[in-house]
Structure formats: C-alpha cells, structure tokens
Amino acid sequence: KHLSRAGTLRLAPGLKDDVVVGGVRYFDTLVDDARHTLTVLRTAAELGAVVRSSTQVVGLTKVGSRVVGARLLDTDTGSETTLSADVFINATGVWTEEIHKLAGVTGPFTVRASKGVHIVVPRDCLDADAALCFVTEKSVLFVIPWGEYWIIGTTDTDWDKNLAYPAATRADIDYILAHVNEKVRYPITVADIVSVYSGLRPLVSGTSESTTNLSRNHAVARVAPGLVSVAGGKYTTYRVIDQDAVAAAVQDIRGRMVPESVTDTTPLLGAER
C-alpha cells in the first residue's frame, strides 16, 4: 500500500520530517531463526535422522576417487568416530571449500564469506509501529521490532579471518548508526546498544570484488564420486535447496531405489497445531 508523507509519519513518527516523501507498506513474516533451526532438526530426527552437535569433519576416506567415509571429531570430548555412507552431502556453508580440501578436490564453484552485523537497541530509541526498511548506497538497512527491542542492520563486507568468529568491528557499528541516524529524529548512540551480533553468509562466488551483488541463489554439484556439495541460498528457499541437494546425491547411489522427495508435503513438528 502506498503511503503519503503524512501517512508514513503517522506510522513512524520517529522519522525525520525532512527525509520522508512517502512510503510503501507491505506485510512479511517474522521468524525466530534459532527456534526454526531446532524445529527442522527435531523434524529430521522424528523421521529417522541422527542429529549431533559439537561435531567437526576432520577427514574423509576414499577408495580410489570415491569418498566412502568421514572422520568426525566430538569437539566437547575430543573423541573421534568414523562414518561410512554411499554418498555424503557437504552442506557446510562458509566451510564448503574446507571439505573440498579434505577430499582433495576442487569444486565448480567457490564460496565467499560475507559478514553481516546487527545491533540491538531498546524499543524506546525509536517511535514507530512497524518495521522499517531504507535503501543505502550499498544495500538496504532494516529496523525490525523484536519484543522490547529493535534489531538494526545489516552490513555486507568480505570476511577472510577465522570463519568461526566473525567479529563485529567498531566500523561496522558506526556504519549502521550513521545510516539509521540519517533517518531518525533522535540519534541512536553506542550507549543505547544492548547487544551486537554477526554472522557469515555463504555466497556462491562471482567475479565482482564486492560481495553485495553476488547471487544469493544456491548451487549444487557432484564434486567427487560419493560427495555432493551445496552452497548459497537463504532461509526462504531452504526446502528447495534440500530437495536439489538430495536429488543430486540420489543420482550417485548405486543399486538402490530411492523414493521421491516428500518435503513439499511434510510439515515441521508442531505445524499442525
């Protein structure tokens, strides 16, 4: 729905008068990502999957060129186990190429890590009755209501350091504050921030120096006999990603019939309530 300048300011009186010329209102979903991930895992376990946390792949076993086993390290206890399978799916996000190295192969695509940072501030920092979205020179900035807080972000920058610890920098925080403060009536300061968090997007690599315009689409490939890799994608397409990756793996299973995918008709646990 198109909104006039006055209509936009009624919805978000915390915006500066002189930056608003109008607005567009639309409705979207709000997802608790941690709960969603746990629910997907619980659903998989209900269907027969074995789910392990604190587990790292530290080696792959090959017979000839075919991957036939994986060495798994329990990072809590230090114990190792070996898993055998007809086919392995490498769905490790920004660690995709680390698995390729363990297999001694080079995949048809590479994955670049793009760091995204968000800040969290109390709801009274901004007077608004809806989430807000602004266009920046590089991307977009979201101001999202979350309980008693606003989540504000994000950034989009290359990350070539420790993949397990994508730390937010003062420059990241200053970037977010500078852009949101261009729009809001009362400036938000570092002192208002109650939390900062960051993560890495696994982007299928292109030729551009910047990650901003790299494809968020996913890619699936059989990188070696017995090993299928999938990378890229996003939350909203996770079932399609899943289906494509499993379909590629099924093609590499020898001497066994595999039933068709049922993901498009299988609800997550609790969805029927």
What are these regions (language model features)?
Residues 1-42, 46-47, 52, 60-66, ...:
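Flavin (FAD/FMN) cofactor-binding and adjacent substrate-gating region
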Residues 26, 70-74:
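Short beta-strand segments that buttress and anchor functional surface loops
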Residues 31-36, 83, 235-240:
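Substrate-binding strand-loop-helix patch
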Residues 43, 101-152, 157-273:
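C-terminal catalytic lobe of FAD-dependent flavoproteins
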Residues 54-58, 74-76:
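Conserved SAM/SAH-binding loop
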Residues 66-71, 127-129:
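Short, hydrophobic/aromatic-rich segments at coil-to-beta transitions
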Residues 76-87, 91:
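Core beta-strand elements of the Rossmann-like FAD/NAD(P) dinucleotide-binding domain
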